[in-house]
Structures are given as C-alpha cells and as structure tokens.
Regions:
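Membrane-interface helix-loop junctions in multi-pass transport and translocation proteins
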Residues: 1, 46, 106, 113, ...
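C-terminal transmembrane helix end/exit motif
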Residues: 1-8, 66-72, 142-146, 173-178, ...
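Residue-level signature of transmembrane alpha-helical cores of multipass secondary-active transporters
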Residues: 13-28, 32, 36, 54-63, ...
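Membrane-water interface segments that mark the loop-to-transmembrane alpha-helix transition
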Residues: 78-107, 154-160, 203
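Membrane-interface junctions at transmembrane-helix termini in multi-pass inner-membrane proteins
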Residues: 134-161, 203
Length: 206
C-alpha cells in the first residue's frame, strides 16, 4: 500500500513538473520571442535599439517582478484569500504607477541636461509601451505567486491550454501585421494581458 502511494506521488510530481515546464516554455516564448522576431523582421540595428530601451525602461520592472514573485509566494503559501490578493493588487498598481513616473522622469532629466542623448522624444511610443509592459509584468508576478503556491495539475493544465491557444491565435496577427517595433510591443502587451486574465480567472476558483 505504501509503495502504491509513493508511486502515485512520484507520478503526480512528474506530471506537475511537466506542466510547470510547459508554463515556463510559454512565458519564455512571450518574454523573449520578440527579440528574435524583431531581428528577423527589422534587422540587427532595430533589435539593437530595442535591447537598449528594454535595458533602460523594462529591466528595472523585471527586478521588482522577480523580488515580488519570490516574496509573495512564501506569504501566499501560509495565508491566502481573494480579498488579500485584491488589496495587494491595488497597492502594487499604485506603486508601479509611481515607479513608472519616477523612472520616466529620471531618464527624461538625463536627456534634458545633456548627460546622454537617449532619443526619448523620437522613440516616445516605444518607451511608453515598454513602461506599460513593465507594469503588466509586475501585476503578473503577483498572480503567478498565487498559482505557484496553490496550483494543482488540473489548474496548470487549463492555464497552459488557454495560454497556448492565445499564442496560436495571435501569432498570425503578429506575423502579418507587425509593421513596426511599436506594434510588436503592443502585441506582446496583449499576450501578457491575456495571460494575466487567464491566471486571475483560475485564481478565483481556488
């Protein structure tokens, strides 16, 4: 009996690990696939500029995203309900907005005082889109913490299925209608928003 239980537990662990692997694959696809697409569609110069603005206006959000993810998963493991999540989401949105304003203002001042020409005005739509994407990814990190703390195989299966379907549905649009780097970022934002909605929908069932 003990051996059967152990065998079942191992199989469940393998199944859950595989589902998490698919989750990581889909997030890597929407998190890093844009670089390869921009390079193939617009050339090395365009992807070089894109990397430059990502490092300045998106990477700072990624640092907070990682911190929030590790911190909150421990908290949600011990205590969780939907009202706590909603409160944290509101606080995080406020923090993220303030941080966005400070980040944009800081680099705008750097350019204004002639410290470094970031060409913000000529690439304003890309800069603002990346900052908005950073906000979405911070919100996602909180939702992901809940999933990481309380997900089961059924939940992971539903999340992965819906995520893959959203990528497959939007992929032709991205391929045929990406006329600029800005539009590529907009499509990536849409994918992240869809992912957040999928996560939140599943979280409500916990």
């Amino acid at each position: 009996m003990i051996r059967l239980i152990e065998k079942e537990s191992i199989l469940e662990l393998i199944k859950k690990s595989f589902l998490f692997l698919i989750t990581l694959f889909t997030i890597s696809l929407i998190g890093y696939g844009d670089r390869f697409f921009i390079e193939s569609r617009f050339g090395l110069a365009a992807v070089g500029d894109y990397f430059f603005y990502i490092n300045i206006f998106l990477f700072p959000f990624s640092l907070f995203q990682t911190y929030i993810g590790f911190k909150e998963i421990v908290i949600f493991k011990n205590k969780y309900d939907l009202s706590i999540l909603k409160t944290k989401l509101i606080l995080l949105l406020k923090f993220s907005f303030i941080f966005s304003v400070l980040l944009f203002s800081f680099f705008l001042l750097i350019e204004y005082f002639g410290i470094y020409d970031l060409k913000i005005k000529s690439n304003l739509e890309i800069v603002l889109a990346l900052i908005f994407l950073g906000n979405i990814k911070i919100i996602y990190s909180l939702l992901s913490s809940v999933i990481g703390a309380h997900s089961d195989n059924s939940m992971l299966y539903n999340i992965n299925l819906k995520s893959i379907c959203s990528i497959l549905l939007l992929a032709p649009v991205i391929y045929y209608f990406s006329y600029s780097v800005f539009l590529v970022i907009i499509y990536i934002i849409i994918l992240w928003v869809i992912r957040c909605l999928i996560w939140y929908n599943q979280i409500q069932k916990i």
